[in-house]
């Protein structure tokens, strides 16, 4: 189950969303998914449907693995991050053994650091966290904090062009060690 890249989002969504799409994600026309595809494409990574012939270069997961009640923007509890991070997220990272982990948003980034017991000197803004770059986990795994790629964040905090720039160091980290990589 090895993958060079692991992308960690916040949560899977709601029970209503799950039931509406019969357990499958609405892959086309969902702004978050479309934006994530663009960002991944910018670093040379493509998402394929399950069962498609692929290299296993990416593993997608979330900091919270359960479904929540309410709408997709419904709040999540801090204890869900603590519980899922310790019991599920850290073991997932250890099993997948990615070279790079991308944390989609502040909450996903905090969940990863908390799962590993990493104390981080938090700057005043998440923008500064993103600008400071990656943090190393054990076994030289790099965690890159980036903004979430949902439409609301893209429209209010960090547009697509800025996010594409945020992902450039991720591309370099994935290529490091490859022949001819910078």
Can you say where each PLM-predicted feature lies in the sequence?
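Charged phosphate-binding loop/patch that engages nucleotide di/tri-phosphates or the phosphate backbone
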Residues: 166-182
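Alpha-helical scaffolding within the catalytic cores
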Residues: 124-135
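A polyanion-binding, active-site-adjacent surface
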Residues: 1-124, 140-154, 160-161, 173
